[in-house]
Amino acid sequence: DETXTDEEFN
């Protein structure tokens, strides 16, 4: 599961 927003992944 992805427990973060796109901002954290970018």
Swiss-Prot record:
It comes from the Eukaryota. One of its GO terms (molecular function) is toxin activity. GO terms for biological process: defense response. Glycosylated. Heterodimer of an A chain and a B chain; disulfide-linked. Significantly inhibits growth and induces an apoptotic response in HeLa cells through cell-cycle arrest at S-phase. Exhibits highly cytotoxic activities against cancer cell and non-cancer cell lines producing IC(50) values of 0.15 nM for human cervical carcinoma cells (HeLa), 7.71 nM for rat pheochromocytoma-12 cells (PC-12), 11.20 nM for human breast cancer cells (MCF-7), 15.80 nM for human leukemia cells (K562), 2.79 nM for African green monkey kidney cells (Vero) and 3.92 nM for normal Madin-Darby canine kidney cells (MDCK). This is Malanin chain B. It comes from Malania oleifera (Garlic-fruit tree).
